[in-house]
Amino acid sequence: MDQFEQLINVSLLKSLIKTQIDENVSDNIKSMSEKLKRLEYDNLTDSVEIYGIHDSRLNNKKIRNYYLKKICALLDLNFKHVIESSFDKNHIVAKLCDATRAKEWQTKSRERRLKNFNLNINYDGPVKIFVAATAEQKLLLKKTRDALLPFYKYISICKNGVMVRRDEKSRVFIVKNEQNIEYLKANKYYAFHSDSVDNFESENDSEKMLQNLI
């Protein structure tokens, strides 16, 4: 092997090593990003976000606790389940003892539909409670609602994405990305024809992107 060939081999080897290093770094960054997202999500599942309380003093813990206690009394919830609370921009974040309690708060809020008047605030506006979610989940929820309401009555954030269902008795679909949204939007016929659901599963491969919960 002459000197020229050796130089070519060395250059090729360096290029291969650099490519391998770049791929490893990229994989590590992706893995770390996924772990951070999971940690962020796990940290939020036992919390709720409360929007709409028309009071400029919500950064004060005593004021927050006053309203949290009022909400608990109105919705038949237990204030002892509240571990801590904070104020973030335009809403209260209440950390509860577990994810089950967070879902309970959201469910009872939907059933009662509180208003500021219920909290002795002279303002005609709703107070809404949601299970806490990441910015990414909230964006997916907004896109799903914009595209699928009113064809699907129930649209809400869940563990694996956004839950979509026609009514209380219909099947549940989990939307994980915009492709899922477009598929359901194109097939909104199924939102009104429950007897056609079986065909929905076998029509083509694209619906396999949707996770169906039985």
UniProtKB/Swiss-Prot annotation:
InterPro entries: FP_N. Pfam families: Baculo_FP (PF03258), Baculo_FP_2nd (PF25298). This protein is missing from baculovirus FP (few polyhedra) mutants. Interacts with IE0. This is Protein FP25.
